[in-house]
Each structure stands twice: as C-alpha cells, then as structure tokens.
C-alpha cells in the first residue's frame, strides 16, 4: 500500500577519536570522525547529536562519502537525534578490498550490521541515497528488528534485488525503444560491466573534474528527453574519445568548497575501482534478495523521496516504482523539484520531508 505524502516542495566510543569537521550553528553538536574495526572490515563514520538520542543512520551512494549528509546530520542532530553517516565499503576511510565480489550487497549489509552492533543495536531509522537505498532496503528486509523505519532517496526499493536484469523490464519503452536503447537509461550500468577498466581509468584521469562533472543540479528541461546515461556505449564511454572529464568547476550550491575538497581527497585515496565494483555483483545480489524473509516484503514505515527531474530513477514516468509499491505495506512517497542528488540539491526540503514523515509515522 502506498500513499503520497507531504506534497512537492520547491555512539559508542571509537578508535578514531573526535576530530571536529564542522557545524553550522552553535547549537549543533560537533560533527566528529570515528573508526570502527571488526575482524572483517573497518568503517569510518561521522557522528553528531546526543549519544542517547534516537538513532538515525545515513547511507550514501555512488560516488559519495558520509560527509554528503552534512546538512541532514546537522538538522537532525540539533533536534536530538544521534546521527551516524559511514563511509561505505570502498569509500573514504573505510576498507576497500581488492576482490570485486567483496562489494556484493550481502557483504555491505554485514558491514552495517556490525556497525549497528557497535553503536548499541538500538532499532534505527535507516536513510539511504542512490546505492545507499538498496543497502537500507536490504537491511530492513533481512534484519527487520534493526529498523524502525526506512527512508529511500532517489533509488526505489527492489525486493528482488537492485540489479540490471530487474531494471531493464521497467524501462519506459516509449522514450527508449528497445531496438535503439536496449538498456534504456541504465546503459551506463551495462557499460560499467562490459568496460570496467576503461571506466575506472576515465574517471581517475582527473578526479576533481570527474566529480564536478557528475555533481550537477537537475534540469526540468530534461524531463521527457533521452538521458545522457543512455548513450554511454554509443559514445564509447561517459567522456567519449577524450577519456577524461572536461574541466568543470564544482557547483558551490551542492558542495561547499571545503567539503568538495574533502570529497576529492577521499577519491584521490580510494580511486574509482572499488566504488564501481558495487555494480559488478548482479548475480550475487539477486541470490541474496531471494533469501530475505517473506519475499523481501517490508512492514516498517517506508518513505521514498523522488526527484521530479531525475533522468534515471524518477518513478512517476516509468514503472520503476512498481516493485516498491507492491513490497511495502506502509509506503509514503514525496516528490521534490530536483534531479538525482537530492540530499545536496534540496537540503532543507529533504529534511522537512523526512521530519514530516517521522511525525506522521509516529517515529
């Protein structure tokens, strides 16, 4: 069951210490850096808010780091939430195994289970953006007692697994005829599978330019148009024959200069091989989804936040949201006038959407 909600808007001690990375107001608890290690993995995470406050864990996607959530952390920490934002596996200060199979969703969910135990294992609100959404959804499906509610941003929930074979059947074939665009807007996903080394090399040719070129605000003029992501194979890569991103200034409305520098520093360390390996595990991710209790049905309250101008993941002009609507017993949907990078494009509006849903859901 789904309902449209809220309308459209314009822990524990850790080895890493408490390095202050900033706060926007005097009444906001300092955002601090921590590191947690288990025998199998190390997770670097940011935290803010009272240690005994209700727990909110925010999971970033590709190609992001935990710092992407700064605005949301500061807002909810100032309201008494204990907010935690890890660098996910392969990113930033967290472990980056060499094997591609180490980035299967079951491994990443295991990371979050260990982190959750380290934080005290109180049932949490799990918030995910982009690839963080499949992680949050899978954790709720496989470990329901750990989740009070789930917020999925940009990428909807797929009970059978967020994998290319499950995405292609949902493509809008009026916009993407199968004979011209067999993988539709997901062509970039296919290209990562078929041209992995080239993709990594192209992204790493100029890290600041790559990140600046990826982080652009959504454009309402793109609605109903073929997405550039559908042309990656035809163009021989995201950047074509240049094999590197064009010189592009970062958008200060998305990342402050200080935070963009931190993002670049993180990718100078990790590169793109580990973060792109998340795309290489369709078979394992589908198999993992099949092991979820009750077919992956979610009984917790779920909020999905859709970007009206998201050329890849918008659920209003395609069938992309159908599996989520069928699988979530208590689903709320809100739409924001933005593209894919909702936590950055609509910082305050996203906070308000989550806040309203928390209140309405009694969370």
Specify the residue positions occupied by each region the protein language model found:
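Active-site helix-initiating loop/hinge in glycosyltransferases
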Residues: 61, 104, 130, 345-346
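Conserved Rossmann-like nucleotide-binding pocket used by diverse enzymes
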Residues: 32, 55-58, 84, 127, ...
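Short, hydrophobic alpha-helix immediately C-terminal to the catalytic nucleophile
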Residues: 70, 137-141, 351
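A short loop-to-beta-strand scaffold at the N-terminal edge of the catalytic core in hydrolase folds
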Residues: 39-47
